[in-house]
């Protein structure tokens, strides 16, 4: 039994070696027609990297010929399927420019835009590629609003917008973390104004409340009452939009202290009359 297993493994290794050897011979061959045939076989079998190398070799040979359109599309798509998105975007765009009347024009335009989408980095990094991806996807939607890919394109734009929102919000929140409370207030105001429909609006209003709280409770006496009242207004604003806010416990705890301080101001004012 053990001998059979070893024999089977040896056979597999030899088969792979022969296969690799045949593929290398094909790469070194001058038989363009056979390369084209095998490139499509590899592509259809999901061996996109192997297909890609063959397509790359034969693209110049078929340029200007009837097969060129098909080959260039599959060349681009083999990059896409191999997750080489930068090269895929370039080749799809090359296809779109070369064959504007192709039956595959929508698919190529969409996949070019989708390639930019896949290149968008995590929110903590520079978002230049995210903006570019949104632009490409929006251009696609404008060109083909009824396309079968339009819904997916809109969904990708929404995801990228959320990434930009998170980026801006984390910057706004960072001001609070480093105790630059005035900048935190301004940044969160700008964030809410810039992204009125954001899912992070509740938290942004809360972070602004926290910044106002730190300023108000540490103010000199001459400015304290006005700032505590501003804090009351921010608290009321949060409850108006989010009556069951996730931050209720902390908000109520802080407002108890605020209200007690305001009562002291009211008592002092009454006694002075």
Predicted features, each with a name:
Residues 2-6, 19-273:
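Acidic, polar-rich low-complexity tracts and alpha-helical solenoid repeat scaffolds
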Residues 10-17:
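Bacterial N-terminal signal peptides
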């Amino acid at each position: 039994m053990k001998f059979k297993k070893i024999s089977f493994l040896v056979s597999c290794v030899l088969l792979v070696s022969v296969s690799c050897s045949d593929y290398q011979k094909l790469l070194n061959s001058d038989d363009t027609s056979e390369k084209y045939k095998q490139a499509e076989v590899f592509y259809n079998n999901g061996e996109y990297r192997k297909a890609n190398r063959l397509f790359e070799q034969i693209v110049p040979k078929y340029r200007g010929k009837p097969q060129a359109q098909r080959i260039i599309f599959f060349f681009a798509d083999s990059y896409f399927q191999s997750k080489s998105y930068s090269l895929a975007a370039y080749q799809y765009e090359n296809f779109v420019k070369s064959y504007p009347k192709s039956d595959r024009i929508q698919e190529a335009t969409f996949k070019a835009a989708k390639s930019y989408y896949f290149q968008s980095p995590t929110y903590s990094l520079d978002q230049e590629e995210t903006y570019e991806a949104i632009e490409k996807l929006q251009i696609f939607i404008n060109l083909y609003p009824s396309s079968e890919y339009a819904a997916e394109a809109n969904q990708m734009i929404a995801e990228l917008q959320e990434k930009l929102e998170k980026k801006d919000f984390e910057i706004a929140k960072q001001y609070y973390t480093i105790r630059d409370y005035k900048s935190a207030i301004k940044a969160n105001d700008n964030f809410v104004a810039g992204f009125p429909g954001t899912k992070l609006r509740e938290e942004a209003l809360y972070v602004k409340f926290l910044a106002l709280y730190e300023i108000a409770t540490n103010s000199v006496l001459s400015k304290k009452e006005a700032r505590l009242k501003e804090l009351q207004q921010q608290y009321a604003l949060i409850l108006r939009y989010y009556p069951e806010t996730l931050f209720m416990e902390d908000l109520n705890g802080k407002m108890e202290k605020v209200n007690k301080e305001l009562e002291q101001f009211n008592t002092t004012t009454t006694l002075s009359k």
